């Protein structure tokens, strides 16, 4: 994938589970607005925060100034990072890495391509970057408290060939 704008949720999940490098191997350029960076690194004691900061410092993730939020700022159910990431994706005409259900719905309504953390894992497995998806999803649910429905997990595992 060429250029992708990321929201904090899947970025934190991938970094916290030790898979930020997998994401960076899949995308040619990962861009985040300043607010998303702040959300990811507000508590440097949390897993993944230092990995995200280090990737930005090393230039592996490009941090840009927050764009004008535009139409996305008026959508009540979006947090600031989601609204700004959606705005940036519109400006640079790229897909967005986002897991929030409302954020994904808004992106699709505005013809923004969407990929989520699970989609990144499926691509990673297909490209041979990881051998199994299930333990990563389990670590997101158990270790991070990441909200993944049982039906979504089952669907992803079926696509990954890890469950029938």
Predicted segment positions?
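Hydrophobic alpha-helical interaction segments
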Residues: 118-160
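Active-site-proximal, substrate-binding regions of enzyme catalytic domains
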Residues: 2-94, 101, 109-112, 135, ...
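Mid-chain, well-packed structural core segment of small domains
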Residues: 100-105, 109-117, 126, 130
